[in-house]
Structures are given as structure tokens and as C-alpha cells.
């Protein structure tokens, strides 16, 4: 018996297998802010893909996918480039010069590091309101003065969906 693949107009055919728990988690994350806690390797990024595809279907573009390291940001970017049936996806890190970043921020889907995002929001290079969905990978890092905290604080009161993903939660001591 072969595995069933996700069928969606914004997901490349035969690129992602259907897993009921991912579909169920994504269904909830489409309708409310969520923190998804799943062990490494169980497909948190695939859950995010389902949510992103839903936002694209509804015309609710403007997706910001944040990850704490350039390596993770690049992994998410490559995954989305290979699984989403659109070309309007950009990768932004601190290695990109200011003028290049200004042009990259206009894409529908942005994969970026939180520090450059926080700094470019402060510089008014990017407007947080251009996003309808912000995904925080490794969300357990959102403590203290980490850039995730500053970004999330700016979302307070705005109708921007937030999706946090992590394999671990911080202990009380870390908080």
C-alpha cells in the first residue's frame, strides 16, 4: 500500500505525504494562534506548510517564517521552494545588504532570522502589518530579550496569526 500525498493547489504534487496528525494540527493553527510541540522529525514544518497553503488559497498572503539560525532559515526556505507551487519566496539573513533586503521584503513568503527581522522593523524597512501569518520555529527561545519577544510584542492587538513550533519547552529556570 503506497502512502497518500497531500493534494492542494499550492503544494507541489507528490512532494508531501498525508499524516492525519499534521493535518489536524494545521487545521487548528489556521483558526487560532497556536504553539505546536512535537518531537524532532515528526513534521512541524509540514504542519506550517499546510497553514501557509491555506493562507495562500484564501488570498491571505504575507507569511513570515522565522528561525533562529541561518542554517534553519535556509532549510525552511529550501523546503518551501521545493514544496510550494509559487516562486514568490525569499530568504533574508544578516548577510544580505540593506538594499537587497529592501527588495526581498516585498515577497509573499519570507524566511528570515529574528534578529534581522526585528532590526528591519525598527528601521522601517519592513512593516509588520504586511504579514497575515508569522511562524516562530524553535519558539521555546521566546524568552527574555530574544528577538522573538520583541516581534511578538509588536503583534499584540493586531489580527496577525501566530504559529509557534518547538520540540522542547523551556524549564521554569530558563524562563
Set out the residue ranges of the language-model regions.
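N-terminal helicase ATP-binding lobe
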Residues: 1-175
Amino acid at each position: 500500500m503506497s502512502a497518500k500525498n497531500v493534494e492542494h493547489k499550492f503544494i507541489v504534487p507528490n512532494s508531501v505525504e498525508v499524516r492525519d496528525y499534521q493535518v489536524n494540527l494545521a487545521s487548528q493553527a489556521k483558526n487560532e494562534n497556536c504553539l505546536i510541540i512535537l518531537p524532532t522529525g515528526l513534521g512541524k514544518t509540514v504542519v506550517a506548510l499546510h497553514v501557509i497553503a491555506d493562507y495562500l488559497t484564501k488570498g491571505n498572503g504575507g507569511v513570515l517564517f522565522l528561525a533562529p539560525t541561518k542554517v534553519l532559515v535556509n532549510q525552511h526556505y529550501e523546503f518551501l521552494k521545493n514544496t510550494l507551487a509559487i516562486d514568490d519566496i525569499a530568504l533574508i539573513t544578516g548577510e544580505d545588504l540593506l538594499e537587497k533586503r529592501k527588495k526581498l521584503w516585498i515577497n509573499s513568503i519570507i524566511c528570515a532570522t529574528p534578529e534581522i527581522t526585528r532590526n528591519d522593523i525598527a528601521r522601517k524597512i519592513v512593516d509588520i502589518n504586511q504579514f497575515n501569518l508569522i511562524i516562530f520555529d524553535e519558539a521555546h527561545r521566546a524568552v527574555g530579550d530574544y528577538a522573538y519577544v520583541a516581534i511578538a510584542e509588536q503583534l499584540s492587538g493586531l489580527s496577525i496569526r501566530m504559529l509557534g513550533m518547538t520540540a522542547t519547552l523551556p524549564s521554569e529556570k530558563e524562563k
